[in-house]
């Protein structure tokens, strides 16, 4: 009888633990079906700039063709956690997001939650996009709706064992994800505050220019100090004064427009795509990004 009692206790404890795990990893969407914050129509002209600042085409454009606005997805993003494929976000109603409402895009960007209520993998940088304004989400959706439909779904993700159960992405979110809008600093000017938003939210610069731990979370002490390319083909540079302290704000803004560095070099690898996008922004936005980057605290480059 005693052994049976212990068995019952173990079973109950396991059931309680499983229920707790299920509860804490539950996907939580920020916006409900009738949320009034998403009622207003967006501006596609403004959305085009959000699209450029967010570097959306670099991941979601269909590989192997020149049109960056054919958003069929499928680019292979290799990492220590598997190979991930950005999805089709074209207006195709079957294979893309043509049937989405604005709230679906808002929940994807600001919560990392799909319309079917599942977690997105953090290869989609929603930990940065979560700082976006709702107005920018509305404008982005308005622009996306002007783009052509592209048939065909992206190939499936191939995650490693750590992320093979998508529900467990909820644990990752508990550690590394927080929906926290950018707070303007009243002691700084409008340009600096605009730059903070572009760098920290839309541009998601820290997602590449930082080092990560074994679970894929950014190490706070390396934020913007550079990090290994997860595809294993290089190293993203330190963009704090420790590495580019002798660059002027004009140097940074020029790089974002032309890809040229002060030492007469040029950016390479994935940064070429970034420059393609930042070159589309108004000059005041590039100046704002430069002003914010110039203010970053000095951090030593971590060892590879």
Question: What are these model-derived regions, one by one?
Answer:
Residues 1-42:
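N-terminal export/targeting leaders of redox proteins
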Residues 16-26, 101-115, 128-154, 250-262, ...:
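C-terminal capping alpha-helices of c-type cytochrome domains
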Residues 27-52, 171-200:
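Electrostatic cytochrome c docking/interface patches
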Residues 39-76:
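Short extracytoplasmic
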Residues 47, 53-63, 105, 140, ...:
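The canonical Cys-X-X-Cys-His
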Residues 59-65, 110-111, 125, 145-146, ...:
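Detector for the c-type heme attachment site
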Residues 75-104, 127-135, 222-263, 274-287:
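Electron-transfer interface patches adjacent to heme c in soluble/periplasmic c-type cytochromes
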Residues 152-170:
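Extended, well-folded interaction surfaces typified by the phenylalanyl-tRNA synthetase beta subunit core
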